[in-house]
């Protein structure tokens, strides 16, 4: 009898002719997230990936596997040969463990998936036989409508017995949908946007704008911590840090006050566009949400997007703030995001920002600025570092 983690694959299993490539990517992600942890063989068998457990580090393996996109459920499982003696041994062991942890459980139900169609019994007959094993060894009852717990049996070449199915994040394996450059601030929204795009298989790197010394080094350390949190899901990432204070000063001197926010956003998009082109990114990602702040009106977003012909993904665009906060708490970025450090958007903040800008009007206001030079100078002072893929347990 062998202890394994059984990983259910969700969308990956629907990929038809490309399924093999997605499974390979997923196995690679699993291996990356389990580095520096003892474990046995990792293998694919009829729609699931299995990780052999070594020693007493099951909880550590579970915590790491929860961060792998493409996995829907994780089940601590006993793998045995497909014969009734070893199956009963596994069933008795796992039910005994379950009842010790949950003495309040009084009822159960068996669910069987018969992958080996050559096996002489059908799924209902197998479930009945396993149910008999439980009733013979424990003082509990069958309840097919509302049981306290399930005993699952996946019968393949070998047989897999489990009770718990721990929910993971699902999605697609990292790196199966291109590369994206995330505009990462210190707020609640942008880390969630990065998480959601990484969940769809995008390999996410981060671009952060600051206005040092008007913004502090502690503010940038906060953003680096958020980047590290994202990397726990997507692996090591590149962190670009760009000081836009000189750009903001030029905007403050030369442009109408009510247009400063939208013009600053356009410069951020210019910098992002240049970095994306120079480094082969397929898309730009932001945490913008329709109507949340002055620059996030339909007109404002249209004026911002006019800077680039790269696709700009805004995965939060129609979400309520409470839903965004729920995700931030779930992925452990919320507490860092609400730390009270200033960001570059608070520098030269207009009292009454323009809500309905036009491309023609904003381009007219930008005429006194040497946009290309300002962007080149900012990128010339850019700092780049690798962050994350931490060994957090």
Predicted features along the sequence, with ranges:
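The feature marks non-catalytic terminal segments
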Residues: 339-393
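Hydrophobic/small residue at the entry helix of a nucleotide-binding pocket
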Residues: 188-189
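A conserved beta-strand->alpha-helix junction
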Residues: 227-253, 343
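Cofactor-binding loop segments of dinucleotide-utilizing enzymes, especially the Rossmann-like FAD-
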Residues: 185, 209-211, 244, 288
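A short alpha-helix-loop-beta-strand transition element characteristic
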Residues: 332-340
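General small-molecule cofactor/ligand-binding pocket signal
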Residues: 143, 240-242, 313
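Active-site adenylate/phosphate-handling loop in enzymes that bind or generate adenylated species
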Residues: 132-134, 138, 171-177, 248-249, ...
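RNA-binding accessory domains that recognize and position tRNA/RNA substrates
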Residues: 1-181, 194-238, 306, 354, ...
């Amino acid at each position: 009898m062998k202890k394994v983690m059984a990983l259910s694959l969700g969308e990956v299993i629907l990929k038809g002719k490309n399924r093999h490539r997605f499974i390979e990517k997923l196995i690679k992600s699993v291996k990356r997230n389990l580095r520096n942890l003892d474990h046995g063989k990792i293998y694919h068998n009829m729609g699931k990936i299995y990780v052999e457990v070594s020693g007493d580090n099951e909880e550590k393996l579970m915590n790491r596997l929860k961060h792998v996109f493409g996995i829907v459920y994780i089940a601590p499982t006993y793998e045995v040969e497909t014969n009734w003696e070893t199956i009963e041994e596994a069933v008795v062991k796992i039910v005994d463990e379950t009842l010790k942890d949950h003495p309040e459980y009084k009822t159960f139900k068996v669910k069987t998936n018969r992958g080996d169609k050559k096996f002489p019994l059908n799924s209902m007959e197998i479930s009945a036989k396993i149910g008999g094993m439980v009733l013979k060894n424990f003082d509990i009852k069958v309840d097919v409508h509302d049981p306290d717990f399930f005993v699952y049996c996946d019968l393949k070449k070998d047989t897999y017995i489990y009770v718990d199915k721990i929910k993971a994040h699902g999605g697609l394996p990292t790196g199966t949908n291109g590369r994206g450059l995330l505009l990462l601030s210190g707020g609640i929204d942008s880390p969630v946007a990065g998480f959601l795009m990484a969940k769809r298989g995008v390999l996410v790197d981060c671009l952060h704008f600051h206005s040092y010394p008007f913004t502090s080094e502690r503010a940038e350390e906060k953003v680096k911590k958020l980047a590290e949190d994202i990397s726990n899901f997507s692996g090591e990432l590149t962190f670009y840090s760009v000081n836009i204070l000189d750009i903001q000063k030029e905007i403050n001197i030369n442009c109408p006050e009510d247009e400063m926010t939208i013009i600053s956003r356009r410069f951020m998009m210019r910098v992002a566009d240049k970095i994306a082109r120079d480094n082969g990114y397929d898309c730009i990602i932001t945490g913008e949400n329709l109507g949340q702040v002055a620059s996030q009106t339909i007109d404002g977003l249209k004026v911002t997007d006019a800077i680039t012909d790269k696709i700009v993904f805004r995965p939060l665009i129609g979400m309520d703030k409470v839903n965004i906060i729920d995700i931030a708490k779930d992925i452990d970025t919320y507490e860092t995001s609400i730390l009270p450090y200033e960001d570059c958007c608070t520098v030269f903040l207009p009292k009454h920002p323009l809500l309905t800008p036009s491309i023609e009007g904003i381009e007219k206001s930008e005429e006194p600025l040497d946009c290309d030079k300002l962007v080149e100078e900012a990128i010339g002072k850019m700092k780049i570092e690798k962050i994350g893929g931490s060994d957090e347990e």
